[in-house]
Amino acid sequence: MRVLVLGSGVIGTTTAYYLARAGFEVVVVDRAEAPAMETSFANAGQVSPGYASPWAAPGVPLKALKWLFERHAPLAIRPTADWRQYLWLAQMLRNCTAGRYALNKERMVRLSEYSRDCLDELRAETGIDYEGRQLGTTQLFRTQRQLDAAGKDIAVLARSGVPYELLDRAGIARVEPALAGVADRLAGALRLPNDQTGDCHLFTTRLAELAAGLGVEFRFGQSVERLERDGERIVGVRIDGRLESADLYVLALGSYSPRLLAPLGIRAPIYPLKGYSLTIPIVDPAMAPTSTILDETYKVAITRFETRIRVGGMAELAGFDLSLNPRRRETLELVVGDLYPRGGDLARAEFWTGLRPATPDGTPIVGATRYRNLFLNTGHGTLGWTMACGSGRLLADLMARTRPQISAAGLDISRYGNSQENSTHVHPAPAN
């Protein structure tokens, strides 16, 4: 069976790899000139299943109002003329109840934990090198109020069987020695020892090479225009004016996925959540992070690669604007300068932005559609790197009619309604 995968970010590439392993003939199409050149290019670098949480949470509406007036707020809303922005916000607000938060977080943690296990297996099988570290993630709380509020997340971790450790100031200095000088300004920390780090762009590039070795064909520099349908089937993809056909199709185009789905009558509530990062050369390894640090106040992650520090975070609802906001750079520099003032050379930092494809409930969309041969793997928000391997393998199993290793409940697009356009009465074809 021939599969056309649209998108060569970390999601599309992992999907292609697992499909090829399952015996499918796979072609990947992307407008970029290489894998992982957009959202996957310079993300925060963390593989953090335990911190898989939706932005839609109790208390967020009030916090968002307060953040409107803060210079270094983690969330910013830039009103546009796009009605989809306001619809997405309304849907997000409906998910800010305690019950919805717990349900959404369970789905996200389930997929993220599985994805971490898939990454471990992939690394053991292939020896893929992406500057990965398996040294955990530490979430820093600057106030006692933040530490107390973490109780609801800790409860979910406990129910999900995720190991964790609460750290006092001495414990923070033990796991992250470079923070010893600032530990007295922190209230405490939550450490997840099983979390990991790694360069997502490097991983995707090298996985694409492994996929090519399995027969996957990558076609770069080609723009996907629209999907063509006939009844309940997709009959082809219009690419640079020509029609490309396959037996099965996978849409993994991140924030751009809804544009292709809307003409098919599929409403995918995905909106771009703009994020920023700095990549900083390390000048003193002893004063740099050991693994990943999450600053709860600013919602910023600081991650250690071999010779670089990656500082990433922020969330802007600003449509598809890819301009670099200097105020966001100030925030990233503020956080890393406060916690690791001697670790890297900020004067040589590279500033970047990308559009994360966010759903209003935080859970990605992985699975079938009402079209018998169209599948989705998109909407991973800030957790594309964390969820990539698990999402790719899960979808490949579903398409091959192989029993998945985890439950796929609540992950496909049918959770957004029972209308005809979102029903999932599909019959995926098996691999030869």
Curated annotation (Swiss-Prot):
Pfam families: DAO. It catalyses: a D-alpha-amino acid + A + H2O = a 2-oxocarboxylate + AH2 + NH4(+). Its EC number is 1.4.99.-. Its cofactor is FAD. GO terms for molecular function: D-amino-acid dehydrogenase activity. FAD binds at residues 3-17. InterPro entries: DadA, FAD-dep_OxRdtase, FAD/NAD-bd_sf. Keywords: FAD, Flavoprotein, Oxidoreductase. The keyword Oxidoreductase applies. One of its GO terms (cellular component) is cytoplasm. It is an enzyme of class 1 (oxidoreductase). Pathway: Amino-acid degradation; D-alanine degradation; NH(3) and pyruvate from D-alanine: step 1/1. GO terms for biological process: D-alanine catabolic process. Oxidative deamination of D-amino acids. HAMAP family: DadA (MF_01202). Belongs to the DadA oxidoreductase family. This is D-amino acid dehydrogenase. It comes from Azotobacter vinelandii (strain DJ / ATCC BAA-1303). The gene is dadA.
